[in-house]
């Protein structure tokens, strides 16, 4: 079922307002649930109960935290640029919510007698618009770090800038193959192109690259370098408290939902029902697709929680090397392969599908196997042993450091003299 672009822009004002309000409520409720579930899942994975004090089984903990932040005293550090300091959380939050206007939740439905798509609006370049909004949201992080007048927030903002520049390139290149096979950059048209086969099965390398890039784009573990507590206290929001801090956290979780929803729309069929539910004739009609879409989005949110509980934070050089040395070159090569196979399809070659699937699996496997390469650093002691003459091999045993006396060797010499 295709939703043409001409279906947008004809809703009455009250229906547009109702859609916008529904998206806002949907995001706010999902943020409350996501924060609670993240803390619960982390607790279960770390063999502890997690939040269990406010409400039955701790289900009201997120609401209590939000009320607490709203009622806390607003503390403004001395020496800050007040206008930029207060504007930064707003700049981060507004683009995060705006991006959801282009996410398709379902097909055309009837609302009080009006036929309308379950999407606020769409554009011929909607995916690029979402990519641009995510880049604008980073301005809030950079400005917040700069306006705080402190070293740690400034370093967090600079890290965030480098992170977005690096991983938005890889993310954009992962979209290119999707645009080639969907024939459109509109989110609703891309979802319609996956009516029979989801793009994750045809364009697996694009999905793997996007999956890694979306974690880096949202500053989440193991790529949470802009707010690394062991290095930068709390990063760009070190000097923020009360509602301003809550707005930064809200923007972070809404951005997680935005990139998760975009992954659902671009690679997992959007609101189309998964197998075997798609065998039911009514699975992709009415309001049921909203349920399928939400379930897919939450699958990606669970991956976020799982990664945070499982993987340690990367070093900054490892993180940047992953983007520039692996993801971007791999994206360029895969786009070239996908374009060649698309050309074969356009020229009427009958067996383009198995060629694309096999190429996709082989390239994705090679990409996953290459993920360790940017992280491996030659062991300095091994290099020292290899460079040392044979007679000095004993001097390079474990525990030896240049400029530090080898106490064991000194003791042996003293014993020999006695």
From Swiss-Prot:
- Matching InterPro entries, A to Z? NADH_UbQ_OxRdtase_su1/FPO, NADH_UbQ_OxRdtase_su1_CS
So what family is this one in? Belongs to the complex I subunit 1 family.
Q: How does it assemble?
A: NDH-1 is composed of 14 different subunits. Subunits NuoA, H, J, K, L, M, N constitute the membrane sector of the complex.
Q: According to its UniProt record, which reaction does this protein catalyse?
A: a quinone + NADH + 5 H(+)(in) = a quinol + NAD(+) + 4 H(+)(out)
The record's Pfam families line, in alphabetical order, gives:
NADHdh (PF00146)
Keyword tags: Cell membrane, Membrane, NAD, Quinone, Translocase, Transmembrane, Transmembrane helix
State the superkingdom.
Bacteria
Q: Carries keyword tRNA processing?
A: no
| Protein name according to UniProt | NADH-quinone oxidoreductase subunit H
Question: Where is the chain membrane-spanning?
Answer: 15-35, 83-103, 123-143, 164-184, 197-217, 262-282, 287-307, 321-341, 349-369
Instruction: Give the species.
Output: Mycobacterium avium (strain 104)
Region (Disordered): which ranges?
394-418
């Amino acid at each position: 079922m295709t939703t043409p672009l001409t279906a947008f822009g004809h809703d009455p004002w009250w229906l547009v307002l109702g859609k916008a309000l529904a998206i806002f409520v949907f995001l706010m409720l999902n943020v409350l649930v996501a924060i609670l579930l993240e803390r619960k899942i982390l607790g279960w994975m770390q063999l502890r109960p997690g939040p269990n004090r406010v409400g039955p089984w701790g289900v009201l903990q997120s609401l209590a935290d939000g009320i607490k932040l709203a009622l806390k005293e607003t503390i403004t550090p001395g020496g800050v640029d007040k206008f930029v300091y207060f504007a930064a959380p707003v700049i981060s939050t507004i683009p995060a919510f705006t991006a959801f206007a282009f996410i398709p939740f379902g097909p055309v439905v009837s609302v009080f007698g009006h036929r309308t798509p379950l999407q606020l609006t769409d554009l011929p370049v909607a995916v690029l618009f979402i990519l641009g909004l995510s880049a604008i949201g980073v301005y809030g992080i950079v400005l917040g770090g700069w306006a705080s007048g402190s070293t740690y927030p400034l370093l967090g903002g600079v890290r965030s800038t480098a992170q977005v520049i690096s991983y938005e390139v890889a993310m954009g290149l992962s979209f290119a193959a999707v645009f080639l096979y969907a024939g459109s950059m509109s989110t609703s048209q891309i979802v319609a192109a996956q009516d029979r086969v989801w793009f994750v099965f045809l364009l697996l390398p694009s999905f793997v690259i996007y999956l890694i890039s979306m974690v880096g784009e949202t500053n989440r573990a193991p790529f949470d370098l802009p707010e690394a507590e062991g290095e930068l206290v709390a990063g760009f929001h070190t000097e923020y408290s009360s509602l301003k801090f809550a707005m930064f956290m809200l923007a972070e979780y809404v951005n997680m939902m935005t990139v998760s929803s975009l992954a659902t729309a671009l690679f997992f069929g959007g609101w189309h029902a998964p197998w075997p539910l798609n065998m039911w004739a009514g699975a992709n009609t009415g309001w049921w697709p909203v349920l399928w879409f939400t379930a897919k989005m939450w699958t990606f949110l669970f991956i976020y929680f799982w990664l945070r509980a499982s993987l340690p934070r990367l070093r900054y050089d490892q993180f940047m090397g992953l983007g520039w040395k692996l993801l971007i070159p791999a994206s360029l090569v895969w786009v070239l392969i996908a374009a060649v196979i698309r050309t074969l399809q356009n020229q009427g070659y009958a067996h383009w599908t198995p060629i694309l699937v096999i190429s996709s699996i082989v390239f994705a496997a090679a990409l996953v196997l290459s993920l360790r390469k940017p992280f491996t650093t030659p062991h300095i002691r091994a290099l020292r042993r290899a460079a040392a003459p044979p007679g000095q091999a004993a001097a390079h045993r474990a525990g030896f450091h240049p400029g530090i006396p080898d106490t064991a060797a000194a003791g042996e010499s003293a014993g020999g003299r006695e």
